[in-house]
């Protein structure tokens, strides 16, 4: 029998983080530390979970933030919920619990982006899954929808040879213009922060780097 629960992120942190770490789709974005970080930037956090025989089996760390001058509140689940996506009963109970939690917090929009590979859940199955649980797929994503995994064991020449010609051209062009790559340290954080701020400004204004 499934037991439902809801709690602020500050409670039972160790148990929740252990659940996230052990889950096959677990992510930094569902951890206590991520909730603490987001809370510093205007988000609030709530956890919804399911237990079976006293053990956590599914759940979601939901982030909330007001949009449009406080008129609308958004509920967002990055890289979640964490669940057994083949267990329809579990998913139905979990999404109902999430919907209720979002409603109680005044959210007018719920967005979730599970950390699933396409071979686990192809796009057509995604669409059906969203609709079964009251949602709809969206092309507007917050988290990067794709990840590139590169095997670093071959030689550099072999790795480059496996890339598209345009990619190789851009890499060599950057080298000719003096671009270098190195591992950063804590001393680089201020410069990185300035770069991120400038990138965000360009994104919001529609300008391009020059």
What are these regions (language model features)?
Residues 2-71, 114-121, 128-210:
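A conserved beta-strand-loop-helix scaffold within acyl/acetyltransferase catalytic domains
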Residues 70-140:
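Acyl-donor binding region in acyl/amide transferases
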């Amino acid at each position: 029998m499934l037991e439902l629960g809801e709690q602020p992120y500050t409670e039972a942190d160790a148990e929740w983080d252990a659940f996230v770490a052990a889950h096959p789709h677990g992510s930094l974005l569902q951890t206590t530390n991520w909730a603490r970080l987001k809370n510093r930037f205007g988000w609030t956090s709530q956890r919804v979970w399911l237990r079976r025989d006293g053990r956590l089996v599914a759940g979601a760390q939901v982030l909330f933030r007001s949009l449009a001058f406080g008129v609308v509140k958004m509920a967002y689940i990055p890289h979640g919920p964490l669940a057994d996506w083949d267990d329809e009963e579990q998913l139905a109970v979990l999404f109902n619990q999430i919907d209720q939690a979002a409603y109680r917090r005044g959210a007018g929009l719920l967005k979730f982006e599970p950390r699933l590979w396409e071979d686990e859940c192809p796009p057509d199955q995604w669409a059906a899954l969203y609709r079964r649980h009251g949602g709809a797929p969206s092309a507007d994503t917050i988290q990067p929808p794709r990840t590139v995994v590169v095997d670093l064991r071959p030689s550099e020449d072999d790795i480059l040879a496996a890339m598209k010609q345009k990619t190789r051209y851009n890499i060599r062009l950057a080298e000719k213009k003096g671009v270098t790559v190195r591992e950063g340290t804590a001393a680089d954080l201020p410069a990185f922060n300035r770069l991120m701020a400038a990138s965000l400004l360009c994104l919001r204004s529609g300008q391009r780097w020059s």
